[in-house]
């Protein structure tokens, strides 16, 4: 029996890769060490608390995107700092590639107001983080990155 060429044999259909959507999240702590959170109005995460963030628009840097998202969702002005971590989250027909950046409050206003995709916004301390319905893995991930005080 002649040798078969390499690659002959049973074949499995190629699984198309899901599109990847670049996203950002903002890790913003106030002077009291509380984390800025928004309650999501829309999917994914509707009704759950998470850090402000969203999709990176074409032509935007990560810093520009996170500063824009925080302002749209909370009315606050922040300055983007260094990335603190990166996660991938499977979505409905897409994979979200999320880079979370540490951000600092930069001037007025200092009280957040919900807007855009947020139906509520708050600064949460450690006790709040334990009782709020946050997006899956949020608190554990941020703690694992050392992004939360205490």
Question: Over which residues does each language-model region extend?
Answer:
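Conserved hydrophobic "DFG−1" position in protein kinase catalytic cores
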Residues: 28-29, 37, 103, 123
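A structural signal for short, well-ordered beta-strand segments
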Residues: 24-26, 83, 100-103
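NUDIX/MutT-family hydrolases
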Residues: 102, 112-145
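A short coil-to-beta-strand element that immediately follows conserved catalytic motifs
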Residues: 77-85
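A generic structural micro-feature
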Residues: 16-20, 48, 92-97, 115-118
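Conserved N-terminal beta-strand and adjoining loop/helix that marks the start
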Residues: 2-35, 55, 86
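Conserved Nudix-box catalytic region and its N-terminal flanking loop in Nudix hydrolases
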Residues: 34-72
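Active-site-adjacent beta-strand/loop module that shapes the phosphate/pyrophosphate-binding cleft
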Residues: 87-111, 145
């Amino acid at each position: 029996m002649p040798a078969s060429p390499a690659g002959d044999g049973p074949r499995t259909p190629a699984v198309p890769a899901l599109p990847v959507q670049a996203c950002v999240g903002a890790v913003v702590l106030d002077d009291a060490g509380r984390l800025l959170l928004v309650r999501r109005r829309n999917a994914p995460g509707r009704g759950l608390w998470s850090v402000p963030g969203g999709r990176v628009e074409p032509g935007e840097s990560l810093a520009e995107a996170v500063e824009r998202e925080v302002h749209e969702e909370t009315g606050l002005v922040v300055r983007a700092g260094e990335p603190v971590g990166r996660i991938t989250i499977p979505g409905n027909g897409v994979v979200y590639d999320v880079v979370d950046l540490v951000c600092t409050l930069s001037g007025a206003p200092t009280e957040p107001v919900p807007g855009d995709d947020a139906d509520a916004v708050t600064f949460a301390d450690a006790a709040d983080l334990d009782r709020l319905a946050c997006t899956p893995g949020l608190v554990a991930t941020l703690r694992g990155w050392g992004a939360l005080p205490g």
